[in-house]
A protein has these predicted regions:
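Sec/Tat-exported extracytoplasmic proteins
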Residues: 128-131, 135-138, 167, 171, ...
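A non-transmembrane, solvent-exposed segment enriched in polar/low-complexity residues
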Residues: 17-162
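Sec-dependent bacterial lipoprotein signal peptides
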Residues: 1-17
């Protein structure tokens, strides 16, 4: 009787684990025969490896993971090439990509936010190229310091205005708006939530929306704390 009960309990536990909601990431990577493809979580504390597969000739892959309770960010990686995407209640995300231009020439289906994240990624890539071109011209003494600084300021302003209007304030309750806040240029955050009052407003808009929808999510609390710290830093000193 005890053995039967133990078997029943184990079966029940396994059934419970298997019934937990999952999401599936599937697709193919062309021209990547023999390459390792990694699925990783982009957590607040850093990148966390989740699964991997050695790609065969057709490049097909399929990963399954527990579905997050609130929107979370993940990435596919081949060597140092990365595709970022997000998941909330989505059951399936489909991604097709060539090995050569893995990070930029991919298609993603399953959730509109992941498509928006691709748009933001491509914009950031173009911005980085434009900034690199400016730096190269300045180093070659083709631009004076004043012209270089003015040109850099214009590039950054145009980029931030575009992202603010079309991605952050347009839909602050989305994963793509959150993703936009943390984009980087030369490893520095494009939006400065600790020292720039206008940028703090962007973080505040997303923090409010996230907190309303997912009040107990770790990302909601973290974003709220960033906003509070930024407001304290930029508060006008009392006379």
């Amino acid at each position: 009787m005890k053995k039967v009960t133990l078997v029943a309990l184990v079966a029940l536990a396994l059934s419970s684990c298997n019934s937990d909601p999952k999401f599936n990431v599937k697709g193919d990577v062309s021209g990547a025969d023999g390459k390792m493809l990694y699925l990783e979580a982009s957590g607040l504390e850093g990148i966390v490896p989740l699964d991997s597969i050695k790609l065969k000739g057709d490049g097909s892959f399929s990963f399954k993971q527990l579905r997050p309770e609130s929107p979370e960010f993940y990435r596919l990686r081949v060597e140092d090439k990365v595709i970022n995407f997000s998941v909330d209640s989505t059951e399936t995300v489909s991604i097709q990509a060539p090995y050569t231009d893995f990070s930029t020439d991919y298609t993603v289906e399953g959730w509109d936010n992941s498509a928006k994240i691709k748009e933001l990624t491509l914009k950031q890539v173009r911005l980085q190229k434009d900034v690199d071109a400016l730096v190269k011209a300045a180093q070659a003494h083709q631009l004076g310091n004043d012209v270089f600084e003015d040109s850099l300021a214009v590039l950054l302003k145009n980029y931030k205005d575009d992202v603010k209007i079309n991605y952050i304030f347009a839909a602050p309750n989305t994963a793509s708006a959150y993703f936009a806040l943390f984009q980087k240029l030369n490893n520095y955050m494009i939006f400065d939530p600790l020292n720039n009052k206008d940028d703090i407003k962007c973080f505040g808009a997303v923090a409010t929306s996230l907190n309303n929808t997912y009040p107990h999510a770790v990302r909601s609390k973290n974003l709220y704390n960033i906003v509070i710290k930024g407001m304290k830093n930029t508060r006008t000193p009392q006379q």
